[in-house]
């Protein structure tokens, strides 16, 4: 599968690849956040898979407020056909949370995944106690799929949410 990452735009956000000049803004997100390691991960993702997290910038101010993108694209193991499933993740800096930016970005990423990459399914995970992240997934149109036990994922129990391309296309979410 050949992937090509494009810039995305929403009502309030411009989304693009991360670059070295983003380091100081990324470092301000959280005191413990390792901006250098994150940006190296981004460069590796773009180089190896032509895909990675999009930087989320407010159109109004140009402020870098978070990231959203695919952390994995793999065969969809829920079917016996050769189809692709994308797993999404997102992060919004604390001072920008609660404004719907993650949901807005996620919907744009999902549209790109279904329309440009031709994914058949998109899924996202969250810890059961992370109610805000669960709301982002729900507000973006994903439905609860199942619990993933710690033994399966290698991390604490997680709630898996998913949406199929057909369900996305039938919803109002597929419209920009």
Give the role of each language-model region:
Residues 1-95, 108, 112, 116, ...:
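GNAT-family acyltransferases
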Residues 81, 98, 121-122:
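A generic structural signal for short
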Residues 98-115, 131-139:
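Conserved acetyl-CoA-binding loop-helix of GNAT-fold acetyltransferases
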Residues 116-125:
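Conserved GNAT acetyl-CoA-binding A-motif
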Residues 124-134, 152:
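Conserved beta-strand-loop-alpha-helix junction that forms the acyl-donor binding cleft
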């Amino acid at each position: 599968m050949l992937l090509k990452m494009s810039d995305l735009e929403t009502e309030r956000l411009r989304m693009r690849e991360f670059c070295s000049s983003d380091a100081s803004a990324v470092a301000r997100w959280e005191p413990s956040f390792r901006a250098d390691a994150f940006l190296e991960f981004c460069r590796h993702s773009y180089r190896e898979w032509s895909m990675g997290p999009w930087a989320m910038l407010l159109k109004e101010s140009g402020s870098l407020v978070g990231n959203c993108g695919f952390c994995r694209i793999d065969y969809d193991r829920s079917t016996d056909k050769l189809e692709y499933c994308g797993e999404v993740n997102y992060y919004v800096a604390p001072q920008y949370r609660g404004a719907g930016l993650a949901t807005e970005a996620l919907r744009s990423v999902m549209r790109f995944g279904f329309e440009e990459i031709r994914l058949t399914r998109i899924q996202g995970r969250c810890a059961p106690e992370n109610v805000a992240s669960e709301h982002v997934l729900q507000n973006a149109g994903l439905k609860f799929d199942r619990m993933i036990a710690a033994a399966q994922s290698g991390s604490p129990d997680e709630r898996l949410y998913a949406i199929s391309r057909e369900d996305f296309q039938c919803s109002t979410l597929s419209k920009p």
